[in-house]
Amino acid sequence: MRVVTFKAEEELLALLDRYAMNKGLYRSEVIREAIIEFLSVRGYKVNG
């Protein structure tokens, strides 16, 4: 996998971290799942 950097508001990161902690996931896992879901519902086939 490649490393990707992006900017996000502090509030969004706080929510992301809280969700990840509650689910026992890493932040990157939550972001990957969110991107896959985003693309899938728009008709893109994602292998991952």
Swiss-Prot record:
InterPro entries given in the database record: Arc_rbn_hlx_hlx, CopG, Ribbon_hlx_hlx
Alphabetical list of SUPFAM superfamilies matching this protein: Ribbon-helix-helix
Domain of life: Viruses
Residues annotated as signal peptide: none
Biological process terms in GO annotation: regulation of DNA-templated transcription
Protein name: Uncharacterized protein ORF48
Organism whose genome encodes this protein: Acidianus filamentous virus 1 (isolate United States/Yellowstone)
